[in-house]
Structure formats: structure tokens, C-alpha cells
Amino acid sequence: LEKSDTLLVIKDVHTYYEDSYVLQGVNLEVPQGKIVAILGRNGMGKTTLIRSVFGLTPPRSGLVEFKGNSLTGLTPFRIAQMGLALVPQGRRIFKNLSVLENLQLPTSGLAKSKVHRRTEQNIDSEWTTEKVLDEFPQLRDRLTNGGNELSGGEQQMLAIGRALVANPDLVLMDEPSEGLSPRFVLHVGEIMKRMRSLGHAILLVEQNLALALSVADHVHIIASGRFVFSGTPEELKSNPDVLDEHLGVSSAKALDA
């Protein structure tokens, strides 16, 4: 990879969560405009990896770089200003705010400089509240509704939309398909492909194997804090033993669907 094409570099990262040694020497790169998926059973370190990048659970040692700048010691707020956005597990929208208020939050001060910088580069790829509502028409019908009045699928749309209006270079997505109907899962997959086509990179943590393999350019499987497989979706599909051992037989069967 050309260095200029690599947005995120994770080098020999070791992260502890309370007293647990969770990430045990993880190495990862996310190129610009690519989707990199992290798969693995529960408790293997997927969410901790996302938290380590976003400054929520800083690594004990190792390097996390974004666009050539170290993220060590930076707050999540500062990291967001640099062009990262997080769609957290469980959605975490502001349920006491309306849909419109949720969408306006990222541009109300969080990353105005970031938004303006990207606008100058390419105004056509700029995500606005209007463009997000075009992408998620269900939200347009619920603009004045509180976040607590939305279905799970609508809350996930809002969480993704809220990330997009900050116009990030890289979006960290933690289990975006969790609790969604199959129809919404397909929609989330289409949205991720569209984000990639507009130049966004995505680091995706996902339990839904079929979704991850349908969108990812590169896949890593994590087990006990280390990557036990790294390759393309096609390479993973041709390794049923890896699928069985690290993701379970049902996951391998799901690929036949």
C-alpha cells in the first residue's frame, strides 16, 4: 500500500480492559475508501479494538495512527475532529432528542472545521442532513419524533446518519446489524457500499458473517485478542475449517444461504 492511501495503521497494539488482557499484539491497516471487517465470537476483542482506536479504551502499548498522526493520548472528541466517526454497538442515539436534533449534533460544533475542509475538497460528496434523509426516507417521516419513539432499525439508520453528517474519512461501525430485521440488514449493507463509493473507509465489527463478507474488501478473524486469519472474503470462504473453528458451524452454513 502507498502510505498516502492508508488511513488507519494499528501496530502491535496491546489493550487491557480493567484487569483483562484483551488485545494481544494486533496489527491492522485500513486503506482509504475500503471496508475492513473484523469477525469473531463474543468476548474475543472486537469491540475493544474499536474502543482502542477511538480513544475510549486506550492501548497499554503499540501504535494507532490516522492519516500519519498518532492518536495516542487524544480524547474521542479530538479524534472525531480529525475525521473519524463511531457508530457504537447498541446505537446510543440521544433518545430524548428528536431525529432532526440528533442529525444536527455533529455539525453544531463537533467537527465544523472538518466539515468545511471536506467541502472544499469535493462538495458533491458532502453529506448534509438532506442527503442523509434522502438515503433514509423513513427518518424524514419521523423528524420531530424523539429517538425513543423509533424502531430498532430506525435507530440504527439515525446512528449511521449522525456519523455521516460529520463527513468522516473513516467510520468505525460496531455490530450495525445487531437486532435488525433481514430487510434492514440488507439496507445497511447497501449503505456501506454507497459510503465506500463516495470515498469513506469503514472498519466494521460484525457478527453477521453474510453481511460482512458481502461488503468487505478485507477480513480479519480475531480470537483471544489476536488475528488468526487475514485475507479477502473469497479466501475466507475457501477455508471452511477456519470458519468452523473460529465462527462456528452455523456461520459456515450461513454462507450457503
Predicted regions and their residues:
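Helix-to-loop junction immediately C-terminal to a conserved catalytic motif
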Residues: 54
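ABC ATPase C-loop
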Residues: 163-164
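Conserved ABC transporter NBD signature motif
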Residues: 62-71, 82, 124-129, 134
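Catalytic Walker B motif of ABC-type/P-loop ATPase nucleotide-binding domains
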Residues: 171-175
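Conserved ABC ATPase signature
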Residues: 146-150, 154
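ABC-type ATPase nucleotide-binding domains, specifically the catalytic core motifs of the NBD
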Residues: 18, 36, 74, 99-127, ...
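The feature captures the beta-strand-to-loop junction immediately N-terminal to the Walker
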Residues: 39-41
